[in-house]
Amino acid sequence: MGQRFLTLYSKFFQKFLKSKKPPRLAGQWSRLARPLKVVFDCSNGVAGLVLKQLKTGEIKTYFINEKPDGNFPAHGPNPLNPGATNQLQAAVKKNKADLGIIFDADADRMFCIDDKSRFINPDAIARILAWQLKPKKIIIDVSTGWLVKKLQVTSYKLQVIESKVGHYFIKKMMRAENADFGAEQSGHYYFKNFFGLDSGILAAIEVINAVSELPYKLSDFIELLPKYYHQEINIRYQESGIRNQEIFKKIEKKYLLLNTKYLIRISHLDGLTMEFENKIGPASRSLGEGWWFNLRFSQTESLLRLNIETTEKSKFQKEVSKLKKFLQLAAR
């Protein structure tokens, strides 16, 4: 990466760093609402080249794996791989940091660790960014959970629009809807003021801006959020016998026979999505209480991806077991 381009690219991001200094002195983190300690794990990718050029002022920054290395000796380029965040979590704990941020190799994705060294679900990061950015429209994919989906019926005056999973579809929807912000479960965050594209570095900057303005620690913010149980489960074709879209029709038919009374919605936007209310009456419907699942084929791997979310842990385990059983039967 040429130094001139790197400098220009870094200057572009610099303007997003909030400052309460006079305009002629702006462009540092030193006058955020409160000082922070932040640990960056650059995964031996490109993030460190940009972040180290930013003026951080009184914000204490720590870098690990910041040197680009195509062999990715630390933990590989994917932050979601098992053990990939171990170094970052240890560094947050050791330095008593307020926040840890890890990037993938090209820094278009980022994930966060809170001040208690806990991994933060991307849905919660999207919620933080929505609180910080105050967008009027958010684009999400079908695997995004209630923490973001329910923003439009809780305390935020905004519109949440669902898209198919994937860069192409999110970017297309960002332009078509003139949306301010977009989020995917995969750790991609999209910004209108970044040409409608995804940027892990800009997402990191805005998370830092948000955390500095919280009246309490990041971990407190996370603990105050509504509690949902949400997970993506990957099922390989050869393990299940799944081969075509007929699987969705069979699953849909099975649930319609069992739960029609409690069905809230069905969507075929990307695979199959079905949402149900709990069996406690219609009052739960307005709050989105109950559970939902989405089944879709991966665009990049021979996998069927199952996303499921419930309001109770016991319900989560029960519905996962039931869905897996139905999948085995439907694949025959």
Annotate each predicted stretch with a short phrase.
Residues L25-A26, I280-E289:
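Glycine-biased, low-complexity coil/linker segments
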Residues P135-L151, L158-K279, G290-R332:
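Phosphate-binding and adjacent anionic-ligand microenvironments
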Residues S43-G48, A107-D108, T144-W146, E312:
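Gly/Ser/Thr-rich loops at beta-strand to alpha-helix junctions
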Residues M1-K21, L32-N95:
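Gly/Ser/Thr-enriched, mixed-charge loops and adjacent short helices
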Residues L51, L88, L129-L133, A204-V211:
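Buried hydrophobic packing segments
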